[in-house]
Amino acid sequence: MDSLTSAASVLAAALAVGLAAIGPGIGQGSAAGQAVEGIARQPEAEGKIRGTLLLSLAFMEALTIYGLVVALVLLFANPFA
């Protein structure tokens, strides 16, 4: 693998992880804030809100994991080599 392809792969992997973390990070913060606000308004619904929050956080975190998988593929199983 030449140095240009190697450098481009490292840059693409860094962008994949970085950009894949921005959206879910903002979404998780917003969802957690809304959940806290909802629990403060209706404390009796805390269990249902928390369950829904944890499920939605898991789905959001999956997007970041997909970005990590793309980065690992670019670094270790480079399709451009």
From Swiss-Prot:
GO CC terms: plasma membrane-derived thylakoid membrane; proton-transporting ATP synthase complex; proton-transporting two-sector ATPase complex, proton-transporting domain
Keyword Heme assigned: no
GO molecular function: lipid binding; proton-transporting ATP synthase activity, rotational mechanism
PANTHER family per the UniProt record, alphabetical: ATP SYNTHASE LIPID-BINDING PROTEIN, MITOCHONDRIAL, ATPASE PROTEIN 9
Function per UniProt: F(1)F(0) ATP synthase produces ATP from ADP in the presence of a proton or sodium gradient. F-type ATPases consist of two structural domains, F(1) containing the extramembraneous catalytic core and F(0) containing the membrane proton channel, linked together by a central stalk and a peripheral stalk. During catalysis, ATP synthesis in the catalytic domain of F(1) is coupled via a rotary mechanism of the central stalk subunits to proton translocation. Key component of the F(0) channel; it plays a direct role in translocation across the membrane. A homomeric c-ring of between 10-14 subunits forms the central stalk rotor element with the F(1) delta and epsilon subunits.
Binding partners and assembly: F-type ATPases have 2 components, F(1) - the catalytic core - and F(0) - the membrane proton channel. F(1) has five subunits: alpha(3), beta(3), gamma(1), delta(1), epsilon(1). F(0) has four main subunits: a(1), b(1), b'(1) and c(10-14). The alpha and beta chains form an alternating ring which encloses part of the gamma chain. F(1) is attached to F(0) by a central stalk formed by the gamma and epsilon chains, while a peripheral stalk is formed by the delta, b and b' chains.
Protein name: ATP synthase subunit c
